[in-house]
Amino acid sequence: MALHARHLPSSLGDQAPHLLILHGLLGSSDNWQTLGKRYAASHHVWMLDARNHGRSPHDPIHTYEAMAQDVVDFMDTQGIAKASLLGHSMGGKTVLLLSQLHPGRVDKLVIADIAPRAYIPHHGPIFDALLATDPASAPSRDAVQSLLSKALNGDPVLVPFLMKGLHRLKEGGFTWRFNVPVLHATLQDVVGHIELGLNTLPALFIRGSESDYVSDDDLDLLEDHFLHMDHHTIQGAGHWLHAQAPDEFFAVTADFLA
């Protein structure tokens, strides 16, 4: 599958290393543009839309094996032999699997607020809300947002985040850029377990103190698998730590990637 990507060339020129950024579930490359510009001071930055997200193609298959292969195929197409990878949530699990299957293609990896374990799905209300909207016949963005807000109790973070995925159709009406039916049907795969082996790549695991996605026990388990591992906790940040604490997130990750 040919993924859509946003490219920010480095000011350092051709000798700069490559950094690929992979977003989380229901996100897109758009979520990373501000931080991407900062990383471009030292790296050629590629912000990818995962399959069934953003401007990348839709497909009934949505597994980590498929997503990891999509990234490798993208690197092959762009002539990128090796790159550092930064993944948040679903993107982080994709990076974990890719580093297991293709370690020679990875320089360093940054995993943002996710562990390889299986999670109990908690996205039911989100997908119920998305499936209940009929964006194709909606008269305005405000109408769609009103429906989402009502279904999600006016969540001040989640509703604006989801609305970023709403796209106006030329023929009128709207559509979701993310593939709601397929992502809903494959949610068990998205929250599933990633099998880890011994990994010798430099790895940074960064989490938010207010998020329950990465526990101390998770970090202990990860240290059994990653021989060269660092970890950092951003105090006061939740699961969307890169948006809630962008300066600290950038400082810690940029130092690691240098």
Question: Where do the model's predicted regions map?
Answer:
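Alpha/beta-hydrolase fold catalytic core
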Residues: 1-20, 40-43, 80-81, 188, ...
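Active-site loop/oxyanion-hole signature of alpha/beta-hydrolase fold enzymes
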Residues: 8-12, 33-40, 46-90, 251
